[in-house]
Amino acid sequence: MRMSLIHKKSDAMLNYVKTVLTRVSFDARLFEKELRKAIKMLIEEEVAELKRWCYVTFADQQHQVILNRCFVVA
């Protein structure tokens, strides 16, 4: 029961981060700032999922540079 609750909170946080990144994606600086915050806040498995999602969702050149810079340490 407890693990299920933790997993739900974890999924909710990851979904929240995805929503934030989508909404700020128009501004490169803000996008990078929010992505760095998310990487620090999420657990390792969530960061891996976020990384996969980001590279699929933000495939344009501008975001690729930011993703490569942020995920090099993640």
What are these regions (language model features)?
Residues 46-74:
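Short, charged early-sequence alpha-helical segments and their helix-coil boundaries
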Residues 22-23, 39, 55, 59:
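Amphipathic alpha-helical interaction elements
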Residues 2-33:
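N-terminal acidic leader/helix
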Residues 36-43:
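Amphipathic alpha-helical segments that form the core helices of the histone-fold
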